[in-house]
Amino acid sequence: MQSVITDVTGQLTAVQADITTIGGAIIVLAAVVLGIRWIKAQFF
């Protein structure tokens, strides 16, 4: 039973790291899109 709990804890830690990475990528992508829209608004 202890090894199952350890395995689940390890998997949750890995998933949490993946979620953090994906969240950061989404924020960066949104910032880039907003920057491009702002630059376009300056010229048009």
From Swiss-Prot:
Superkingdom per UniProt: Viruses
Periplasmic topological domain residue ranges: 1-18
UniProt keyword terms in alphabetical order: Capsid protein, Helical capsid protein, Host cell inner membrane, Host cell membrane, Host membrane, Membrane, Transmembrane, Transmembrane helix, Virion
Primary location recorded for the protein, binned into one broad class: virion
The UniProt record lists the keyword Transmembrane helix: yes
Transmembrane stretches, start-end: 19-39
Gene3D superfamilies: ATP synthase delta/epsilon subunit, C-terminal domain
Coiled-coil spans in chain: none
InterPro entries found in the cross-reference section: G8P (IPR008020)
Location(s), subcellular: Virion; Host cell inner membrane
Membrane topology reported for the UniProt record: Single-pass membrane protein
Stretches in topological domain Cytoplasmic: 40-44
Cellular component per GO, a single term: helical viral capsid
Recorded family membership: Belongs to the inovirus capsid protein family.
Oligomeric and partner information: Homomultimerizes. There are several thousand copies of this protein in the phage capsid.
Role description: Self assembles to form a helical capsid wrapping up the viral genomic DNA. The capsid displays a filamentous structure with a length of 760-1950 nm and a width of 6-8 nm. The virion assembly and budding take place at the host inner membrane.
Protein name (database record): Capsid protein G8P
Organism: Pseudomonas phage Pf3
Gene transcribed to yield this protein: VIII
